[in-house]
Curated annotation (Swiss-Prot):
GO terms for cellular component: catalytic step 2 spliceosome; cytoplasm; nucleus; ribonucleoprotein complex. This is Heterogeneous nuclear ribonucleoprotein A1. Residues 95-185 are annotated as: Globular B domain. Residues 268-305 are annotated as: Nuclear targeting sequence. The modification Phosphoserine is found at S2, S4, S6, S22, S192, S199, S285, S309, S310, S311, S312, S313, S316. Its main location: nucleus. Residues 218-240 are annotated as: RNA-binding RGG-box. Sumoylated. Involved in the packaging of pre-mRNA into hnRNP particles, transport of poly(A) mRNA from the nucleus to the cytoplasm and modulation of splice site selection. Plays a role in the splicing of pyruvate kinase PKM by binding repressively to sequences flanking PKM exon 9, inhibiting exon 9 inclusion and resulting in exon 10 inclusion and production of the PKM M2 isoform. Binds to the IRES and thereby inhibits the translation of the apoptosis protease activating factor APAF1. May bind to specific miRNA hairpins. The modification Asymmetric dimethylarginine is found at R194, R206, R218, R225, R232.
């Protein structure tokens, strides 16, 4: 049986969200364009279940990850005379995380060991794309490494590829990788989700299940004071000064009173690092870091797909 007939790579890694579609685009015209870069195992334009009108986005699934990379490397794409925005599709589970659908070029890397140097990070992450900046964070007073870093790429596609994969090993140790978001981006993400502005790129099942809450995760909205604590935790993550809220506040703590300086063992009082499921950072479940949080970084230009062609409801909980 051929590789295309029996794909061995996870479907989620082979799927692209295509935003900004013309309302005239059909499954056939979408397929005709994207199959230029490889065999498609699925292709669908999402439509309103009642009116059958296009919702302005769709999904294409390739037979192999290699073909997904080829299509992304061929950007920009124009379908039926309109420039569209392809992005790596986000699973339903991951789509609940704050900022999951924002377009960013920077990642947070947590749980790195004290002997990890810039070249270790570069050696591992350069397989995903061109790296612009690597910043290993240190304590301003002692100069001791704080156990986390930021890596900035020249293309959001590199970040999307990285965060889809659950496990990353740097310098022989597992680490936690998330999109790095500014407080402004977090507020924007929360606002757009509550307003149903069509900023998502969900991708579960055939066409994606568009489930979710009005807020990201389960801990309420993340735009307010102490906004990153989750519903079960005490300290907020990057709220009003307690949390890590950017490079201008290097002496700050990661929420509930303890600084993140044990290189993977965040073991201080009540801060809840994961707004998704409440595990403490360094925690007892859900892998080494417990939850599904995002991490604040230096503000940058905001991105994300929220185009006018996709104004109908995301997050309704129905499957199409």
């Amino acid at each position: 049986m051929s590789k295309s007939e029996s794909p061995k790579e996870p479907e989620q890694l082979r799927k692209l969200f295509i935003g900004g579609l013309s309302f005239e685009t059909t499954d056939e015209s979408l397929r005709s364009h994207f199959e230029q870069w490889g065999t498609l195992t699925d292709c669908v334009v999402m439509r309103d279940p009642n009116t059958k009108r296009s919702r302005g986005f769709g999904f294409v699934t390739y037979a192999t990850v290699e073909k997904v990379d080829a299509a992304m490397n061929a950007r920009p794409h124009k379908v039926d005379g309109r420039v569209v925005e392809p992005k790596r599709a986000v699973s339903r589970e991951d789509s609940q995380r704050p900022g999951a659908h924002l377009t960013v070029k920077k990642i947070f890397v947590g749980g790195i060991k004290e002997d990890t140097e810039e070249h270790h990070l570069r050696d591992y992450f350069e397989q995903y794309g061109k790296i612009e900046v690597i910043e290993i964070m240190t304590d301003r007073g002692s100069g001791k490494k704080r156990g986390f870093a930021f890596v900035t790429f020249d293309d959001h596609n590199s970040v999307d590829k990285i965060v889809i994969q659950k496990y990353h090993t740097v310098n022989g140790h597992n680490c936690e990788v998330r999109k790095a978001l500014s407080k402004q981006e977090m507020a924007s993400a929360s606002s757009s989700q509550r307003g149903r502005s069509g900023s998502g790129n969900f991708g579960g099942g055939r066409g994606g299940g568009f489930g979710g809450n009005d807020n990201f995760g389960r801990g309420g909205n993340f735009s307010g004071r102490g906004g990153f604590g989750g519903s079960r935790g005490g300290g907020g993550y990057g709220g009003s000064g307690d949390g890590y809220n950017g490079f201008g506040n290097d002496g700050s703590n990661f929420g509930g009173g303890g600084s993140y300086n044990d290189f993977g063992n965040y073991n201080n009082q009540s801060s809840n690092f994961g707004p998704m499921k409440g595990g403490n950072f360094g925690g007892r479940s859900l892998g080494p870091y417990g939850g599904g949080g995002q991490y604040f970084a230096k503000p940058r230009n905001q991105g994300g797909y929220g185009g006018s062609s996709s104004s109908s409801s995301y997050g309704s909980g129905r499957r199409f």
